[in-house]
Amino acid sequence: MKRIVFLMTLLMLGSEAAAKCSYSGTTTTQSITLSNLKIPTDPSIPVGSVLYTRKIGTGPYKNFECSKIMNDQYIIDISTPVVAGVTGLQGGPVYETGIDGIGFQVSDLLRSRNGHIVAAEAGNTLVPIEKTSQNYYQDVTIWLIKTKNVIDTSGTGSNPSVSYSVGNLTTNPKKGDRLLYTLSSIKFKDINYRNTSCNI
């Protein structure tokens, strides 16, 4: 009987170890200020159009090794709500910037690669890759999206944040352990609004 209990304990410990993601390195945290923007306010530009694009390098971020079989999760957190009724690039959701009429999308860190950028969607999904070495892409793209026909040019923004994590929610319960990369704030400064669709 003791031997059976011992074997069961070993099996349980072994399955837990297999389900637990492993990490090396540290989380990277950045903030960005989008300044001297030229934003067109031409009402003929359709809602859902890209008004501005900015690509930033993430630098090295935390390495991981997880397992799809063990249902390890990829978590994207975006601090602001979805703009209701508006879709942007790739038919994806657009998130509030705090400026009425302008939303944003951000690229998916683990699904994007050179020549193929994927717009991110907040939420939990199965890990798209099992280890960093399968796609260690080190750029994030931010798109500003038109969400209303009339943009409130007096708005200043709410400094939204975005984070990317991977892990097993049972065996890697600490959010800090799972966190790979955080864009801690997207700020806006000196926006130049122009009633034209040129010089975006």
Regions found by a protein language model. Give the residues of each.
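N-terminal signal peptide c-region/cleavage motif recognized by signal peptidases
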Residues: L13-E16
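Charged, low-complexity intrinsically disordered boundary/linker segments
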Residues: N199-I200
